[in-house]
Structures are given as C-alpha cells and as structure tokens.
C-alpha cells in the first residue's frame, strides 16, 4: 500500500508512480508540500485515491493536526484510512490510549491483512509510542514494503541493534537501492556506524535537501552528522536554520540542548531550549526522562542535606 517511492518518478516494473511527489515529500518531512500535492492531483483509480488520502492524512498527523483527520475520516472509510484514524485518535486523546492499545491487541491476535501496509505501519507506530518496541517490530515484520523495513530500521537503531538494522537495510537495497526511503535508511545506519561513514550520511541528507527541499528532518540529520564528527559550530548553523523554520520542533530543540552543552554556553541558554520543549511538547519522552532524572537528583540531594 504505502510502499517506497523511487529516486525517479517510476514505481516497480518501471511504470510511472502518479503519487511519487506526494510520497517523496512525506518521506523527507516536507509535510505541507505533500498536502498541497495530494490536494492538487487527480488519481487515476479508486486504489490510488485511497493511497493519496493515506499520505494526505498522515501528513496532517505529522503536523499534529489531528482534528482534520478525525473530522474527515468517517466510520465507513476504507480499512487503510480507518488505520490512519486509529493513530490520530491515539495521539490526540491521552485518556483513551490504553483502550486503543487494548483494542489493537485484539485485532493483532486475529488474522491481520498483511497486504494492508498502512494498518501495519499505524499499529507499529502506536506500539512504539506506547513504549512497546517488540510489538512494533513483530507487526512490521509481517510487511514487505520499503516503509515497513525503514521503520524497523529506525526502531532497531533506537534499541542499539545496529547488526539487525544492517540486515534490514540490505533487504531494502535489494528491493530498490535508489528509493528515497532506502537512501534515508542508509544515512541513518551510516550515522549509527560512525567514523568515515558519517560523511556518507551527511552527503545523503545534503543531496536530498538540494534536490527536494531542506526540511527539518534533513537538517537535523545533517546536524547529527556534524555533532558526531565534533563539528559543533557547523551543527549550530544548520540547527539555527531548522529553528527558523519551526521554533517548536522537538528534535531541533533537543539537539540544541546537546549542542549548547558542548559549546559551553551559559546554563540559562540550555534551560531556555528545555523550557521551549516543555511548553510545546510536555509529554515528549525526552522531557519525561529529564524530569525523572531531576526528581532522582532532588531525592538524593535531600538524603545528603545537612540536618538542622
């Protein structure tokens, strides 16, 4: 369903993919461009229309505009769109998350339509947000699309399983080496390998930015390459460009927190980025972890405080 777009506007078998620009924009994080293109094109058949709508609504989710998705996807929509709606419901309604996961568990216990790539991706996204990476990986393992493999690589790298991520990347390269998703996954793996591979990762992010547009996803990728190479000043320039595009983007703010520490900036600078992150994303895993560490520190400090 939501398979990877190639580097040129041709799908498997060499036929033109009329949704290439929509998919490509979505994959590199140019969500508004994906929305604009999805609203402009007239799909040639109902299947393509559904696929276009999947990318349209996933782009709205990426912009945190959950209301648009919940208002527009009705109960009689296709299974693919129902899956997108399920993810929007999960993200928009914290009090209902446990119930949504329980319902998803029941669906996964029955026979799942593995041809519905969108369902697998949305289910895996819910499990991963719910801190259950094993369930996310099990779900994705049932799919064969480039997007399922790319998401598996992201999760495996977060679990420090570079060995398994490299195996998945090899599968992606065998399926379509030039696909946008394969190129992105190559950059993520190179970033994890480090050393001289960091420059290769940087060039992939840079080439995509030059060819398409310099998105927050690509800029943060470039900044991560610079930081891993100890090029802190170069990283600052790229992150500043990202911050100018969106002053509340969580990954940019987290990278600025790390960067300001390494550049020896005053503590208030780091605290400013943390405050911005708390304001815009109070439930972000980084903030929750940071606050847990603060509480641990306060508790330890109390233990060692001099008694009056």
From Swiss-Prot:
<dbReference type="GO" id="GO:0006891">
    <property type="term" value="P:intra-Golgi vesicle-mediated transport"/>
</dbReference>
<keyword id="KW-0968">Cytoplasmic vesicle</keyword>
<comment type="function">
    <text>The coatomer is a cytosolic protein complex that binds to dilysine motifs and reversibly associates with Golgi non-clathrin-coated vesicles, which further mediate biosynthetic protein transport from the ER, via the Golgi up to the trans Golgi network. The coatomer complex is required for budding from Golgi membranes, and is essential for the retrograde Golgi-to-ER transport of dilysine-tagged proteins.</text>
</comment>
<comment type="similarity">
    <text>Belongs to the COPE family.</text>
</comment>
<dbReference type="InterPro" id="IPR006822">
    <property type="entry name" value="Coatomer_esu"/>
</dbReference>
<protein>
    <recommendedName>
        <fullName>Coatomer subunit epsilon</fullName>
    </recommendedName>
</protein>
<keyword id="KW-0931">ER-Golgi transport</keyword>
<keyword id="KW-0813">Transport</keyword>
<dbReference type="GO" id="GO:0005198">
    <property type="term" value="F:structural molecule activity"/>
</dbReference>
<dbReference type="GO" id="GO:0006890">
    <property type="term" value="P:retrograde vesicle-mediated transport, Golgi to endoplasmic reticulum"/>
</dbReference>
<keyword id="KW-0963">Cytoplasm</keyword>
<dbReference type="GO" id="GO:0015031">
    <property type="term" value="P:protein transport"/>
</dbReference>
<dbReference type="GO" id="GO:0000139">
    <property type="term" value="C:Golgi membrane"/>
</dbReference>
<dbReference type="Pfam" id="PF04733">
    <property type="entry name" value="Coatomer_E"/>
</dbReference>
<dbReference type="InterPro" id="IPR011990">
    <property type="entry name" value="TPR-like_helical_dom_sf"/>
</dbReference>
<comment type="subunit">
    <text>Oligomeric complex that consists of at least the alpha, beta, beta', gamma, delta, epsilon and zeta subunits.</text>
</comment>
<keyword id="KW-0333">Golgi apparatus</keyword>
<keyword id="KW-0653">Protein transport</keyword>
<dbReference type="GO" id="GO:0006888">
    <property type="term" value="P:endoplasmic reticulum to Golgi vesicle-mediated transport"/>
</dbReference>
<dbReference type="GO" id="GO:0030126">
    <property type="term" value="C:COPI vesicle coat"/>
</dbReference>
<keyword id="KW-0472">Membrane</keyword>
């Amino acid at each position: 369903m939501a398979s990877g777009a190639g580097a040129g506007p041709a799908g498997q078998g060499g036929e033109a993919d009329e949704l290439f620009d929509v998919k490509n924009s979505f994959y590199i994080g140019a969500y508004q461009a994906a929305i604009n293109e999805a609203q402009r094109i007239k799909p040639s058949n109902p299947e393509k229309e559904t696929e276009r709508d999947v990318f349209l609504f996933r782009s709205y989710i990426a912009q945190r505009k959950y209301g648009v998705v919940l208002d527009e996807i009705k109960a009689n929509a296709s299974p693919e769109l129902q899956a997108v709606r399920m993810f929007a419901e999960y993200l928009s309604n914290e009090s209902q998350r446990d119930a949504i996961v329980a319902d998803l568990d029941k669906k996964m216990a029955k026979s799942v339509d593995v041809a519905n790539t969108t369902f697998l991706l949305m289910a895996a996204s819910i499990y991963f947000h719910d801190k259950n990476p094993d369930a996310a990986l099990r779900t994705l393992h049932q799919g064969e699309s480039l997007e399922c493999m790319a998401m598996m690589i992201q999760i495996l790298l977060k679990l420090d399983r570079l060995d398994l991520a490299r195996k998945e990347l090899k599968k992606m390269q065998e399926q379509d080496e030039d696909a946008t998703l394969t190129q992105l996954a190559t950059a993520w793996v190179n970033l994890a390998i480090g050393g001289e591979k960091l420059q290769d990762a940087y060039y992939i992010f840079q080439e995509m930015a030059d060819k398409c547009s310099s998105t927050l996803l690509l800029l943060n990728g470039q900044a991560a390459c610079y930081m891993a190479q100890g090029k802190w000043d170069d990283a600052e320039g790229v992150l500043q460009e990202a911050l100018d595009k969106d002053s509340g983007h969580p990954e940019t703010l987290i990278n600025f927190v790390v960067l300001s520490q390494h550049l020896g900036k005053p503590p208030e600078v780091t605290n400013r980025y943390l405050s911005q992150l708390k304001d815009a994303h109070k439930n972000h895993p980084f903030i929750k972890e940071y606050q847990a560490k603060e509480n641990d520190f306060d508790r330890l400090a109390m233990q060692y405080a001099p008694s009056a």
